[in-house]
Each structure stands twice: as C-alpha cells, then as structure tokens.
Amino acid sequence: MAHKKAGGSSRNGRDSAGKRLGVKAFGGEHVIPGNIIARQRGTTWHPGLNVGMGTDHTLFAKVEGRVEFRAKAGGRTFVSVLPMTEAAAE
C-alpha cells in the first residue's frame, strides 16, 4: 500500500497586532487637559512641565496649551505643555 506520511505542522504562522504606540500630539500642537501626548513602553520621553505619566508610561496633558519637546543633558527628551497664556505670548 502506498501511503503518504502525515506532514508536520508549521511552527511559524502567527503575529501580534500592532500596539499603536508613538507620539499622538506633536510639538506645537494645541492640547487640552487629559489629551494623550504619547504612548510608549518605558520612558522614551519623560514628563516635563504640565505633563503627567500614567501607569503604562503614557504621557498626558494636565493643562490647556501647546506641546513642546525639549532635549536635555544626558540624552533625555522631556515633553512639556506651555499654558495658553505663555503660548500666546510667544
């Protein structure tokens, strides 16, 4: 009897969905309190003035204003929100 031996199953064939990480509000954009500025794993960007950080390292605005990214010594990038009064003056 001619039989074909059962073929093995592939060990690849799976992939995880993208996690939608990254900057959601770029420098110069207007934000209101609670707006998400960036989603990240770990601290790629650090919270600066008027920016809070959630338990999953998400950065969010605490006040209404304009987003600003600023590189500091040590290679860290801080994200701040300049309040409306300061942003209007510039």
Curated annotation (Swiss-Prot):
GO terms for molecular function: structural constituent of ribosome. Gene3D superfamilies: 2.40.50.100. HAMAP family: Ribosomal_bL27 (MF_00539). Keywords: Ribonucleoprotein, Ribosomal protein. It holds the Pfam family Ribosomal_L27. The lineage of its organism: Bacteria, Pseudomonadati, Pseudomonadota, Alphaproteobacteria, Hyphomicrobiales. InterPro entries: Ribosomal_bL27, Ribosomal_bL27_CS. Residues 1-20 are annotated as: Disordered. The gene is rpmA. The keyword Repeat does not apply. Belongs to the bacterial ribosomal protein bL27 family. One of its GO terms (cellular component) is cytosolic large ribosomal subunit. One of its GO terms (biological process) is translation. PROSITE patterns: RIBOSOMAL_L27. This is Large ribosomal subunit protein bL27.
